[in-house]
């Protein structure tokens, strides 16, 4: 078994053989995915740091992993004694600046071409240019050092059940081609896997939690080529591609195909790996912009939203069963760990119709663990749920008819007045945005302040964004919209009818507890639009169906309108979920949706 020290030695030997002064190994794949197949988990394997995001840098005599504050504690433990330094992003210079400072003039930096985007390479090059430091792509180096490297995944590709699809692949391609024509593009290269899955109406299981498949898609004016291995397509998928006018070529041949084109190529530079463009003729003109399909797939049809509502009902019923079982065990003196919560949730969800998988790793954090917004319990490091405290559960699932993502906080034992105060502040923030009416096309970062106002008034805040887009039986995180005051507003953030977005304010007390209340919501046109000169307005239709624990609400802090919102929401939750529950789950649902009174 290779140790990190063995890997470091092997990396440095390989670097020396190739004339490299430094090697950069990012958390990335050729599709710039959030979740990576094992084949591209080189940073995790070679550094020993298992967090989901980080950048590993090796020089002749130094090594470091750059991680953000979510992972400082984890990285400190995992890197201890390895010869790799923890570099705390935000407190130290970024890795590109560190390289520029620490490397000599005319040095060579290696980075695998399939693990860096065009934008990423440009940013790195800009930092290194003053010292004339060149960038090279040692694409065989990782394979030689990582002898047990897993193969590129090639799981079966299948169609998205036509009962849940409201637009054919051919119709989607026609919409993309219309945008290509507007921009003067002869081709578009699509590298992001959720865009490809959406455009083809196909799904897969190559990537954990995301129903996508490793591939590229090259769209021409009158043809389209899907780069994936033909043998992994089931009969229905192969027939569907033929019907849509798409041909199939091997995954590895995308760069060869691009070497044969001419004219203008539309790409999204921060979603396109350098490896795909290495043989692109110099005569080809690049047109850069966000993938047209990113905008199209963010707007769900009425039929899509109807299916999402149904998925939410099944998800909510599963949660009722889970919480009923959880409370019964805890109230009767039983013992559960954070790991048990994950296992129980999966069991209840997997019994529901249309369930495919979880949509991300469940976050179950008790007390101080919940103060880490992206905490993940492991068999080696987790807490037992006992005594008094707060349990935060952020979880979700993939169903044929939609993707779910929900966060709830429940008390264990007797909550304190401070815990109820914090929870009520978060609830007030959630309600403020959930009830908002806003102009269509407003830039999504601009509405974040609506949510944060109740917390700001109490001189509280949270460090993460308030909302992200959610796919339709696709990735739980998608764009282009993002509700986050830290985001620089741009035209890509325009809020459109049919978008599905999370609303998830939080409040975190390090070492004590964390609170987050998350529902998904769809942008809908207001019921009675006013015919005025001010344009069209939207509101949020709450999609998620699960009680919010009233035991943590301080009604003295709430307005009559906020209490009314809770009661209307709980009445809808009960109405929709009661027919889908029975026994203990139904009893729990009724108990937790009793009207809130002062």
Residues of each region from the PLM?
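Active-site neighborhoods and metal-handling regions in enzymes and metal-associated proteins
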Residues: 1-598
């Amino acid at each position: 078994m290779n140790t990190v020290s063995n890997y470091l030695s092997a990396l440095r030997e390989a670097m020396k053989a190739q004339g490299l002064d430094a090697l950069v190994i990012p958390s990335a794949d050729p599709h710039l995915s959030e979740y990576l197949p094992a084949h591209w988990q080189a940073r995790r394997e070679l550094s020993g740091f298992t967090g989901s995001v980080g950048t590993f840098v090796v020089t002749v005599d130094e090594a470091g992993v750059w991680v953000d504050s979510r992972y400082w504690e984890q990285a400190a433990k995992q890197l201890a004694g390895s010869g790799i330094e923890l570099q705390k992003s935000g407190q130290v210079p970024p890795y590109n600046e560190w390289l520029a400072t620490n490397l000599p003039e005319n040095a060579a930096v290696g980075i695998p071409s399939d693990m860096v985007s065009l934008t990423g390479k440009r940013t790195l090059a800009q930092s290194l240019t003053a010292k004339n430091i060149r960038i090279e792509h040692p694409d065989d180096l990782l394979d030689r050092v990582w002898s047990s490297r897993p193969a590129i995944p090639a799981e079966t590709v299948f169609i998205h059940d036509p009962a849940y699809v409201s637009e054919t692949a051919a119709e989607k391609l026609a919409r993309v081609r219309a945008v290509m024509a507007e921009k003067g593009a002869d081709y578009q290269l699509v590298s992001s896997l959720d865009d490809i899955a959406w455009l083809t109406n196909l799904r897969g299981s190559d990537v954990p939690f995301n129903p996508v498949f490793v591939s590229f898609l090259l769209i021409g004016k009158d043809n389209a080529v899907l780069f994936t291995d033909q043998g992994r397509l089931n009969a229905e998928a192969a027939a569907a591609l033929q019907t849509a006018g798409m041909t199939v070529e091997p995954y590895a041949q995308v760069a060869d195909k691009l070497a044969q084109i001419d004219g203008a190529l539309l790409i999204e530079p921060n979603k396109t790996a350098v490896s795909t463009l290495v043989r692109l003729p110099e005569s080809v003109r690049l047109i850069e912009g966000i993938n047209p399909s990113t905008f199209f797939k963010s707007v769900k049809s009425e039929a899509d939203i109807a299916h999402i509502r149904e998925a939410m009902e099944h998800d909510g019923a599963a949660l009722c069963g889970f919480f009923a079982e959880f409370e019964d065990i805890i109230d009767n003196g039983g013992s559960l760990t954070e790991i048990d919560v994950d296992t129980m949730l999966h069991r209840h969800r997997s019994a529901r119709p249309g369930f495919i998988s979880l949509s991300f790793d469940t976050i179950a954090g008790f007390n101080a663990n919940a103060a880490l917004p992206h905490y993940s319990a492991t068999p080696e490091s987790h807490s037992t749920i006992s005594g008094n405290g707060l349990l935060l559960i952020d979880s979700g699932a993939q169903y044929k008819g939609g993707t779910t993502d929900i966060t709830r906080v429940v008390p264990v034992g007797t909550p304190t007045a401070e815990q109820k105060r914090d929870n009520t502040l978060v609830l007030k923030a959630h309600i403020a945005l959930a009830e908002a009416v806003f102009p269509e096309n407003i830039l999504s970062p601009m509405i974040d302040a609506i949510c944060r106002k109740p917390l700001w008034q109490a001189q509280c805040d949270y460090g993460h964004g308030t909302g992200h887009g959610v796919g339709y039986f696709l990735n739980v995180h998608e764009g282009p919209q993002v509700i986050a005051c830290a985001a620089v507003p741009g035209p890509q953030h325009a809020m459109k009818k049919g978008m599905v977005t999370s609303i998830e304010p939080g409040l975190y007390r390090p070492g004590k507890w964390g609170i987050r209340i998350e529902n998904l919501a769809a942008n809908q046109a207001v019921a009675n639009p006013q015919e005025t000169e001010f344009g069209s307005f939207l509101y949020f239709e709450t999609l998620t169906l699960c009680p919010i624990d009233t035991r943590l609400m301080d009604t003295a802090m709430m307005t009559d309108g906020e209490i009314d919102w809770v009661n209307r929401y709980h009445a809808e939750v009960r109405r929709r979920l009661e027919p889908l529950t029975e026994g203990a789950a139904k009893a729990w649902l009724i108990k937790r949706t009793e009207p809130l009174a002062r």
